[in-house]
Amino acid sequence: MRGFASSASRIATAAAASKSLNASTSVNPKLSKTLNSSGKPTNPLNQRYISQVIERKDWFLILNQEFTTHRIGLNTRFVISVLQNQDNPLHSLRFYLWVSNFDPVYAKDQSLKSVLGNALFRKGPLLLSMELLKEIRDSGYRISDELMCVLIGSWGRLGLAKYCNDVFAQISFLGMKPSTRLYNAVIDALVKSNSLDLAYLKFQQMRSDGCKPDRFTYNILIHGVCKKGVVDEAIRLVKQMEQEGNRPNVFTYTILIDGFLIAGRVDEALKQLEMMRVRKLNPNEATIRTFVHGIFRCLPPCKAFEVLVGFMEKDSNLQRVGYDAVLYCLSNNSMAKETGQFLRKIGERGYIPDSSTFNAAMSCLLKGHDLVETCRIFDGFVSRGVKPGFNGYLVLVQALLNAQRFSEGDRYLKQMGVDGLLSSVYSYNAVIDCLCKARRIENAAMFLTEMQDRGISPNLVTFNTFLSGYSVRGDVKKVHGVLEKLLVHGFKPDVITFSLIINCLCRAKEIKDAFDCFKEMLEWGIEPNEITYNILIRSCCSTGDTDRSVKLFAKMKENGLSPDLYAYNATIQSFCKMRKVKKAEELLKTMLRIGLKPDNFTYSTLIKALSESGRESEAREMFSSIERHGCVPDSYTKRLVEELDLRKSGLSRETVSAS
């Protein structure tokens, strides 16, 4: 491939010059600076400026001044963005304190409390130090009950059970009185921090503080005991809450269903669903997902499927979300046969899955279901309005091409175009790759022409994909043609490009040209990777050039690259041919040390070499270690050892066979 470097260099230089001319040389100074010389914000006020303000000790004064003077309006999205993007949780708290006092609407916004809670959890813990309490007092603000609930919630998620308890015991010093809301926050935090006993203690203290447990209190405790698998206690709590006039809701029953399934009590979980029906409580999406996933979690997959199908026959409450959950579980467990059965059954009921659920189900079917039947199911759902999407079509096309059902694969490729799914270089590249791997490169070339006719320019990945297809064939002429197109389009070859060209030359037995290309690669300043070296090492070994393969192996390790199994095997074989068995054994030890499992080729090569060098006992010892290192001996490896035993007894295989 001489001349490759010079022609590519000319095109690369021109491309670099073009990029330089098109580059922007100036930046809008108003956008690059957030503070002017006087420390005032640029207009409009931006998030970075706010972040700088709340780092200061006089943050509340500046915020009040800026938002009053400039009359800059706040909106929920902006507030959320500021809260989320602070590295210090104290800054998130400061901004929330200010904004919730500046406009009472934000104090009632549940989404802001959730965002603040997440920020305090991710960056925290933020503890109530004396300095922080003084700062809040000096700012003229106070910690409200709602804010205290957010803080307690973050501590609970961080596992600070004792701290939650200690702070709650001293809330009177913060000007607060115990309330059911605060008790609920503490009990929830204690449950989340795995301190159920302490949560029960707080539950028992509520009434002495004049706070009556409500439905939230009971649901929190029921959730805690169900997580532990103590479902009988959960049932007792449900009875107690009913006696106090707190009727269980959908969340209560969802928690109970999950608890019974965690405990493996499927029948009891089904009874809870029946109880919901009797009480005219409709299961929500969380209930149904909990039920389906719980059934699959506590029963063997086939039994779980049987239970759910039986439930579906009796009760129509499974709904669409239930069908989605069942399909997800079937796909996740690679149950192709059951997935096909379920799709047919729910399809008859008019169920139409969304694209992601359908694609997951199709991927499962393609791994183990009859391909013709899979296509029939696919076509049936598409005719009813399902939109499989690009990936849904592509996995089916790949399966058909692998099965050499080319006409059917082409039909779906055509439909992808009709549905407008081929609209970018990325989608075309995926189709071209699919066709190249199926050895249908001529068809792939048609898609290249089509994409260019539509004004979609190929990229380097496109050309590398074609190089990969022709490289496997060892078609040097075609590879050269693709390379010329790649350069004409102004692309600089990368390590993948060079490796594919080298692989093609090696497959065509043009080893000298392969090493010339390797040299040009280095001249271009492109560092070879493991794949490049492994290709050359294997090729040298296959042509008997053992010296060069050993040198490449050493160079590869010198550059910090890890040879693969095939490179190790090829080098071990080279050493054995050179009668340097000790070096070959050292490589085997290296493989085991770095966690690379030798295969039967590795062991048979060494066993044969040890045997031929008169080291029969070591050959047998190596054979006995094969299974210990995670490899099952094949028939050839076993035969080598059998011949050793026969030789030792003075017999030949032919003599044994004749007798």
Swiss-Prot record:
Q: Name one GO biological process term.
A: response to salt stress
Q: What GO cellular-component annotations does this UniProt entry give?
A: mitochondrion
Instruction: Extract the transit peptide range from the record.
Output: 1-32
Q: Record keywords: Cell inner membrane included?
A: no
**Where, subcellularly, is it found?**
Mitochondrion
Q: Which InterPro entries match?
A: Pentatricopeptide_rpt, PPR-containing_protein, TPR-like_helical_dom_sf
Q: Which domain of life is it from?
A: Eukaryota
The similarity comment for this entry is: Belongs to the PPR family. P subfamily.
Q: Which NCBIfam families match?
A: PPR (TIGR00756)
Query: Could you identify this protein by its name?
Result: Putative pentatricopeptide repeat-containing protein At3g16890, mitochondrial
What gene, per UniProt, encodes this protein? PPR40
